[in-house]
Swiss-Prot record:
Gene3D superfamilies reported in the protein's UniProt record: Ribosomal protein L22/L17
GO cellular component: cytosolic large ribosomal subunit
InterPro entries: Ribosomal_uL22, Ribosomal_uL22_bac/chlpt-type, Ribosomal_uL22_bac/org-type, Ribosomal_uL22_sf
Protein name: Large ribosomal subunit protein uL22
GO term, biological process aspect, one: translation
Subunit structure, interactors included: Part of the 50S ribosomal subunit.
Function statement: This protein binds specifically to 23S rRNA; its binding is stimulated by other ribosomal proteins, e.g. L4, L17, and L20. It is important during the early stages of 50S assembly. It makes multiple contacts with different domains of the 23S rRNA in the assembled 50S subunit and ribosome. The globular domain of the protein is located near the polypeptide exit tunnel on the outside of the subunit, while an extended beta-hairpin is found that lines the wall of the exit tunnel in the center of the 70S ribosome.
The organism of origin for this protein: Jannaschia sp. (strain CCS1)
Keyword Kinase on entry: no
Pfam families in alphabetical order: Ribosomal_L22
GO MF, any single term: structural constituent of ribosome
């Protein structure tokens, strides 16, 4: 009568990886995630390698993890993978402050975000 302990959250031809607590704002992370959406994984890795954005290094690690999950856990062919989804969410926002003139206090927000990348195997048509 018990439920399946680990139900599959993606389709049979998909694999995914998540990164949480990334020290950047969701807006900045979404700029980099938008670069790789819908692309083949080889091109996405190349784009992330040569991107000048600081967070591109972490996005590349997450994409490599999704590729490794697809190959090792789900038996998918790496050469036929595309980035099906790359979505960004908000995480916590640390609130800090800085003393300002005349006894005031400036609020400093330090946002965190999370990233989920799903790769899908697509049969190449020729």
């Amino acid at each position: 009568m018990s439920k399946d302990k680990n139900p599959r959250r993606v389709a049979d031809n998909e694999a995914m990886a998540k990164l949480r607590m990334l020290k950047t704002s969701p807006q900045k992370l979404n700029l980099v995630a938008g670069l790789i959406r819908g692309q083949k994984v080889e091109k996405a890795l190349t784009d992330l390698t040569f991107s000048k954005k600081r967070i591109a290094v972490d996005v590349k690690k997450c994409l490599q993890s999704a590729i490794a999950n697809a190959e090792n856990n789900h038996g998918l062919d790496v050469d036929e993978l595309i980035v099906a989804e790359a979505w960004v969410g908000k995480n916590l926002v640390m609130k800090r402050g800085r003393p300002r003139a005349r006894g005031r206090f400036g609020k400093i927000l330090k946002p965190f975000s999370e990233l989920t990348i799903t790769v899908r195997q697509v049969e190449e048509t020729s």
